[in-house]
Amino acid sequence: MSKVYDWFDERLEIQAIADDISSKYVPPHVNIFYCLGGITFTCFLVQVATGFAMTFYYRPTVVEAFASVQYIMTEVNFGWLIRSIHRWSASMMVLMMILHVFRVWLTGGFKKPRELTWTTGVIMAVCTVSFGVTGYSLPWDQVGYWAVKIVTGVPDAIPVVGPTIVELLRGGVGVGQATLTRFYSLHTFVLPLLTAVFMLMHFLMIRKQGISGPL
């Protein structure tokens, strides 16, 4: 077994990477509140896993969406548990993200030279809120439908470009199948991809710059 490991280590420098990860200096002032970002990341992984599981049964059409959610909750083995974990983890992710932002702000973690780390974090915060807005509509029940109608109607107040933005979000003048398709695509592909990319950038910058010192 050691020969196999040595073969890979010679080519990929596995041990050097492992040593770098395990020997990173942690400042003495770090406490439990510095774990909030990691908890948010864990919630994101739970969201990806449970969301992926539900895509096998969910149908993104205005006719079948609600029925498919009911099927997940009542017929699929442990479907009720998977969807419940998805919902609970979503709430936890938003809460932990908010607390993480407050911790970084209060400890000055956004200051030079960590401005870009802060910027990527703000972008991920926007993505997190967008997850909530798009996911809320997917069951396509009364609450989801009217939430979409209200949210997509907000940009209409913007002068000149407002109506164009509304039509772009809805996929037409009114809320319908095109709207659900857009929100489903955003929720299951666009937003997860963007979040993963900015998370990678966020983590790499933290690894490079280290954790900010105490105030």
UniProtKB/Swiss-Prot annotation:
<dbReference type="InterPro" id="IPR005797">
    <property type="entry name" value="Cyt_b/b6_N"/>
</dbReference>
<dbReference type="InterPro" id="IPR048259">
    <property type="entry name" value="Cytochrome_b_N_euk/bac"/>
</dbReference>
<keyword id="KW-0934">Plastid</keyword>
<keyword id="KW-0472">Membrane</keyword>
<keyword id="KW-0812">Transmembrane</keyword>
<dbReference type="Pfam" id="PF00033">
    <property type="entry name" value="Cytochrome_B"/>
</dbReference>
<keyword id="KW-0602">Photosynthesis</keyword>
<keyword id="KW-0813">Transport</keyword>
<dbReference type="GO" id="GO:0015979">
    <property type="term" value="P:photosynthesis"/>
</dbReference>
<keyword id="KW-0150">Chloroplast</keyword>
<dbReference type="InterPro" id="IPR016174">
    <property type="entry name" value="Di-haem_cyt_TM"/>
</dbReference>
<dbReference type="GO" id="GO:0046872">
    <property type="term" value="F:metal ion binding"/>
</dbReference>
<protein>
    <recommendedName>
        <fullName>Cytochrome b6</fullName>
    </recommendedName>
</protein>
<comment type="similarity">
    <text>Belongs to the cytochrome b family. PetB subfamily.</text>
</comment>
<keyword id="KW-0479">Metal-binding</keyword>
<dbReference type="GO" id="GO:0022904">
    <property type="term" value="P:respiratory electron transport chain"/>
</dbReference>
<keyword id="KW-0349">Heme</keyword>
<keyword id="KW-0793">Thylakoid</keyword>
<feature type="binding site" description="axial binding residue">
    <location>
        <position position="187"/>
    </location>
    <ligand>
        <name>heme b 2</name>
    </ligand>
</feature>
<feature type="transmembrane region" description="Helical">
    <location>
        <begin position="32"/>
        <end position="52"/>
    </location>
</feature>
<keyword id="KW-0408">Iron</keyword>
<feature type="binding site" description="axial binding residue">
    <location>
        <position position="202"/>
    </location>
    <ligand>
        <name>heme b 1</name>
    </ligand>
</feature>
<dbReference type="GO" id="GO:0045158">
    <property type="term" value="F:electron transporter, transferring electrons within cytochrome b6/f complex of photosystem II activity"/>
</dbReference>
<feature type="transmembrane region" description="Helical">
    <location>
        <begin position="90"/>
        <end position="110"/>
    </location>
</feature>
<keyword id="KW-1133">Transmembrane helix</keyword>
<feature type="binding site" description="axial binding residue">
    <location>
        <position position="86"/>
    </location>
    <ligand>
        <name>heme b 2</name>
    </ligand>
</feature>
<comment type="function">
    <text>Component of the cytochrome b6-f complex, which mediates electron transfer between photosystem II (PSII) and photosystem I (PSI), cyclic electron flow around PSI, and state transitions.</text>
</comment>
<feature type="binding site" description="axial binding residue">
    <location>
        <position position="100"/>
    </location>
    <ligand>
        <name>heme b 1</name>
    </ligand>
</feature>
<dbReference type="InterPro" id="IPR023530">
    <property type="entry name" value="Cyt_B6_PetB"/>
</dbReference>
<dbReference type="GO" id="GO:0016491">
    <property type="term" value="F:oxidoreductase activity"/>
</dbReference>
<keyword id="KW-0249">Electron transport</keyword>
<dbReference type="InterPro" id="IPR027387">
    <property type="entry name" value="Cytb/b6-like_sf"/>
</dbReference>
<dbReference type="GO" id="GO:0009535">
    <property type="term" value="C:chloroplast thylakoid membrane"/>
</dbReference>
<feature type="transmembrane region" description="Helical">
    <location>
        <begin position="186"/>
        <end position="206"/>
    </location>
</feature>
<comment type="subunit">
    <text>The 4 large subunits of the cytochrome b6-f complex are cytochrome b6, subunit IV (17 kDa polypeptide, PetD), cytochrome f and the Rieske protein, while the 4 small subunits are PetG, PetL, PetM and PetN. The complex functions as a dimer.</text>
</comment>
<feature type="transmembrane region" description="Helical">
    <location>
        <begin position="116"/>
        <end position="136"/>
    </location>
</feature>
<feature type="binding site" description="covalent">
    <location>
        <position position="35"/>
    </location>
    <ligand>
        <name>heme c</name>
    </ligand>
</feature>
